[in-house]
């Protein structure tokens, strides 16, 4: 059961979660709209109305710190009692501890790492599952193509946690193509070319190595592997092009490929 994000940005959208669950051979995913009625629902009503009567749950799997229901009234002890009364199996996942400081792995820590651009630690905490941005490729200004490095442009969903603005070595998968491609991605507001806008939109622009196809209007997923540098404002397009060439070289080294 995946409530929609209403309070804080999400690391994965419901669509991205669905793709991961599909790869694990999960048959169905139920998305509960996080309305005011659901937000004010008691823990018992949620278990009875949603888990039992609607989903006919046979097994419930939650983290050890899981809280639910109005004002977070429900927890593990409540679930143990409810599951015992209704012959439902309950699996409680223990907290994962990481590092010498024995810090608890949490979604907030992962968000903090993304905003710091620390993909190295992020990958360690997620068992090497990269942060990703996915969506349909939009038609941009084609400025990259004019400068000699055409890019795939994605507009992240508003509910999505955006990593630190900057340049990353990335991996790209394209709808209808079984191959993975290596890339170099800029996340940010394109300060060199969008200086006139008072509130420039956040974009994810990716140059893909060794790809000649047309992926406009196709679904694309970009996996973030390593942070290379912060986003910068350059004096002009010539300086921007020179910086991109250096970014491509750095990304190629990360990927272990030759340009």
Ranges and model annotations:
Residues 16, 45, 78, 109, ...:
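An acidic, carboxylate-rich microenvironment
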Residues 29-31, 89-93, 223:
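General small-molecule cofactor/ligand-binding pocket signal
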Residues 16, 121-128, 239-250:
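A non-catalytic, amphipathic alpha-helix used as a structural packing/dimerization or gating element
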Residues 83-189:
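Glycine-rich, Lys/Arg-enriched anion-binding loops that position phosphate/diphosphate groups
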Residues 21, 60, 122, 170, ...:
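Residue-level signal for inorganic ion chemistry
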Residues 139-259:
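Phosphate/ribose-recognition catalytic cores of enzymes acting on nucleotide-derived substrates
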Residues 34, 95, 228:
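Hydrophobic pocket-lining residues within nucleotide cofactor-binding pockets
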Residues 1-86:
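N-terminal Rossmann-like or analogous alpha/beta NTP/dinucleotide-binding catalytic cores
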